[in-house]
């Protein structure tokens, strides 16, 4: 399983803005382990290699998502568990969620 283009862009956006080296390292080494589509979003469980250091820091910002391919804007949350990134939630405020959109703006 690979990251969708949107998932990859979100993780890169968060890593580029994080001042925590461990979070950046975790994001750069993570890969998707499973994905659940909910109808208005998705939950992607992330796997991080065991040799990547944990952190006490939290992800401090998650981008808003705008795309003409959705019927409303959306957002995301990168959850952490026991010092490692764990799950990326992506959601739309509308009723139409397409995980493989081709164009978007993260703010």
Regions found by a protein language model. Give the residues of each.
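Short, compact, well-ordered microdomains
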Residues: 67-107
């Amino acid at each position: 399983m690979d990251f969708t283009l949107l998932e990859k862009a979100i993780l890169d956006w968060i890593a580029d803005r994080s001042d925590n080296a461990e979070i950046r390292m975790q994001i750069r080494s993570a890969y998707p382990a499973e994905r659940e589509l909910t109808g208005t979003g998705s939950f992607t469980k992330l796997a991080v290699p065991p040799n990547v250091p944990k952190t006490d820091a939290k992800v401090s910002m998650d981008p808003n998502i705008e795309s003409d391919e959705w019927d409303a804007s959306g957002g995301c949350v990168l959850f952490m568990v026991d010092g490692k990134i764990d799950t990326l939630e992506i959601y739309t405020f509308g009723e139409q969620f397409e995980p493989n959109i081709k164009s978007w703006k993260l703010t």
